[in-house]
Design a protein with these regions (language model features):
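Short linear motifs in low-complexity or flexible loops
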Residues: 7-18, 37
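Conserved beta-strand hairpin/beta-sheet module of binuclear metal-dependent hydrolase folds
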Residues: 22-70, 154-166
Length: 220
């Protein structure tokens, strides 16, 4: 827990070697919960990955974790409501651009099990596969991984071998793939894409770090 921050805010160090600063859980659920965000960066500022839901308690914890640091960018792996809705209010508070996955486009009138996706998500810049944002000493590159959702992307922190996997690979469970937006063929192809990479460690949106990522992916 950070000095000077209420422990009930749920702040924890997770990955200093990956340039990560904190994981924030603004409410119940712990490390596997649905109110999370990841902050990474250094002296030049930080990047917020998956800022989480637009929940006042969660947003307050996130702002407390950021403190006086400059937010360079707010990024999202996909637009489910536990990942992206806090992007807009956080952008308004910090002035940082929203950069990352594309908005979710629904091309089907079928009933949806995962209907609570974020319809309000409006990025300032969409990252295509292999495009990157960077700062002093770091490069965060998009790795397109459709399957869990059609707009899902992971982020590779190239200098460290860390991959932020969103909901494509979770440490404590297999991901949910719900049609019509989720597609199992796409999901398996994206898993193979990750297996073919040489990332050293995964940081999922839910659950702890995966220290043997290729072994986990092979088992899926």
């Amino acid at each position: 827990v950070l000095d000077g921050v209420d422990s009930h805010a749920g702040l924890a160090d997770v990955a200093g070697d990956a340039g990560m600063v904190r994981v924030v859980d603004g409410g119940e659920g712990g490390v596997e919960g649905h109110r999370q965000a990841r902050l990474g960066g250094g002296e030049g500022g930080l990047v917020v990955i998956d800022p989480g839901p637009d929940d006042p308690e969660h947003l307050a914890a996130l702002v407390a974790a950021i403190g006086a640091a400059k937010v360079i960018a707010i990024t999202c792996t996909h637009t489910h409501r536990d990942h992206s809705p806090a992007a807009a209010p956080l952008a308004a508070l910090t002035g940082a651009p929203i950069i990352g996955c594309a908005p979710l486009v629904i091309e089907s009138d079928e009933p949806r099990v995962d209907a609570p996706f974020d319809k309000s998500y409006t990025p300032d810049r969409v990252l295509a596969d292999s495009e990157a944002i960077s700062g002093p000493g770091w490069t965060l590159r998009a790795v397109a991984t459709p399957g869990h959702t059609s707009n899902h992307i992971c982020y590779a922190l190239e200098e460290t071998g860390a991959l932020f996997t969103g909901d494509h690979v979770m440490a404590w469970s297999t991901s949910v793939v719900v049609p019509p937006d989720g597609d199992m063929a796409d999901y398996m192809a994206s898993l193979q894409k990750l297996h073919d990479r040489e990332d050293r460690i995964y940081y999922p949106a839910h659950g702890p770090a995966v220290e043997k990522p290729r072994q986990l992916v092979r088992g899926m």
